[in-house]
Amino acid sequence: SRGLARCVESLAVSPNAPRCLLATAEGDEHTLGLLLAELSLREHGWNSQWAGRMTPTPELIARIESGGCDMLALSAAEASSDAERLRNQAFTLASACQAHDVHLVLGGRGLWPEPATHLPPFSRVRDFREFHELLARLQN
């Protein structure tokens, strides 16, 4: 994964480009999908900031509140089977993102909730095709 990280770092983007904060869900150590998402972001002209694996929700909220990102991409692998914890984290982060005009993307095959009217808005992507489509929509 270090080789992929070096590839990502080699892609130059404008300092004025939109910024995406990348992290895995609490309790999730799987970062390969997140590295691939970071590569996709760079290819679409986004700056990326790596929060890393198992970043606690309060730390992510502090970064959202500081104005340091336009998007938060949170990944959970299929092995992240604690659906209640993922739902709680998604709701908490969706509320913080909505309050600060940050787009939340929940990705991976973890047991994330589906977008619903009783939740603050977020995007749910299951694979890289859906992620590329989302990035293309956001560029327009």
Kindly label every feature range from the protein language model.
Residues 1-92:
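Conserved binding/catalytic microenvironments
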Residues 105-140:
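Peripheral docking tails and interdomain loops at the edges
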Residues 43-45, 99, 119-120:
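Short, well-ordered coil/turn elements that cap or connect secondary structure elements
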